[in-house]
Amino acid sequence: MRKYLVIFTLFYSYLPLHAQTDTSGKPYLQPTTPVCITHVNVVNVITQKVDADQTVVIEHDRITAVGATKKIKAPANALVIDGTGKYLMPGMTDAHIHFFQSGGLYTRPDALFLNSVYSYEKDQKWVKDNQADLMARYLACGITTVIDVGGPMSNFAIRSQLDTTILSPTAFVTGPLISTYQPPNLDKNDPPIVKVNNEQEARDLVKKQLPYKPDFIKIWYIVMSGQKAETTLPIVKAAIEESHANGLKVTVHATQYETAKLAISAGADILVHSVDDKILDNDMLQLMKSKNVVYIPTLVVMDGYDRTFTQQFNFTAHDFRYSNPFMLGTIMDLQHLDKKAPFDYHKMRNRFHIPSKEDSTMLTNLKLAQQAGILVVAGTDAGNIGTQHAASFRNELLAMQQAGLSNWEIILAATINAAKGFGKEKDRGSIEKGKVADLLLLDSDPVKDLNVPASIRTIIRRGVIIQPQQLLTPSPEALVQQQLNAFNARDIDAFLAPYSDSVALYDFNGKLLTKGKEQMRKQYSGFFNKSPDLHCQILNRMVQGNTVIDQEYSTITGRKPFGGIAVYIIEQGKISTVHFID
């Protein structure tokens, strides 16, 4: 009780001294005149060439002209953007996400049930409350279109909302997954996955979605142990037939060779995952090619589960910057849940190997599909445990690179192929006259370096000009959470990133402990190197304005756990001062 009283006293003692003022302006500009980007290098995904010294004219939300600068005259009243030395590419598409999932530890209770720690209802509320943040992160990563391949009926309301939201990608969605299996513990009022028991129920679930105008239909083709895939094939066929009869493409979750082959033979248009149990043979590849099947490999999603369940992470600076810090933080919670968790993550390391055999199979199958001329589309399955919204897309592209795809092939998979795969190529996916103006102005050539987010100078979404550096302005609490995540990952560079160069650390009596970021680096680098199992848990947090007070509890193998209170003060978007209380 005394500790909480100390926190309460500190909380209010710091408020008058450090009030936060919002001085930020709008991160976007809605032009009232044409926009003309001149002398720019256009990444042409149709010819697979970079066209030098081009001019692109935008009026309202559409591209009205593209061509050599010497041949295109800017409209008299145009807003001119000098693209000299810059590269213009189409906005990217993550073709496999889920709005109803947060990416955190508690978002799939059918896979990991931890309701006694953090309820599924709380996770679902968090997703709804933080939708704007997640969507801004997609834009910041250069993703101007997202495709939700299955969720509750509320997906349709989200699509409508995002359609009128400036700082958000365009969304294409469907409703509940038509499933051969009912996973436990998910929302029963507006279920994201619905088991159908016969052909008529499958048709009825397709029909139920029709008034909402789904962009496609999704089937979850799951075969349980001891069950034959043919047993539920009539259900799959019925759903496909009903969808096609209503002019809708069908996406199918079928990760096994047998279910994938049966689904394709039944008329499936899009496989939303890799086949991971068997190498694709020539018969299968020819079947996929002849049926014009779209292949979305989702290479990183199972790795996210494996790394979370074993607590073996490989976070990058990109992950720390572009992931929502609170959801990224939750996936390290297994290190302090102890007996509340259904398993010991240390023992899980004997079960889950990183990389897994399935990972190797998926990489091989992606390369085979690409070589066979099958339309490959980039997608992450973002929202699943350990697969963070927005940030995971770059990791997916790098995994595709690891599979042996060229940068051009990957860029196509993230742009024009996605548009073609979902029947949107007349409006999206390339920089051509008449198409929607979803564009990325880059400082460097993406054909040479796929790290697109780090290179973005300007985002144009439906003709609106957006400044990426203003999309992710972390709150004081988010900054503190970012450094906590990096502390637990023992990543010194990411840990120091939220701190100001002149940061000062004090004890409770005001004695200066550390001054400046470089001194912090020396102090904490050694600490991280000597503490492989370091983990800090937040027992209580209070936030007001730019002051954050954490009650912390830290564990290190071989040492007695220790606790304390840290008071963080944020100024000009950085942590400037920290007071420690042992």
Language-model region placement:
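Divalent metal-dependent hydrolysis catalytic cores, especially in the metallo-beta-lactamase
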Residues: 128-157, 168-176, 214-224, 249, ...
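Short, well-ordered alpha-helical segments enriched in acidic and aromatic residues
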Residues: 489-506
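Bacterial Sec-dependent N-terminal signal peptides
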Residues: 1-23
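Metal-associated gating/positioning segment near the N- to mid-region
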Residues: 87-162, 258, 262-266
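Histidine-rich, glycine-flanked metal-binding segment
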Residues: 21-22, 27-29, 33-34, 42, ...
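Active-site neighborhoods of metal-dependent hydrolases
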Residues: 204-227, 275-403
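Acidic, glycine-enriched loop/beta-strand segments at the rims
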Residues: 24-27, 42-55, 68-71, 388, ...
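A beta-strand edge to alpha-helix "cap/lid" segment located at domain peripheries
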Residues: 506, 511-512, 518-582
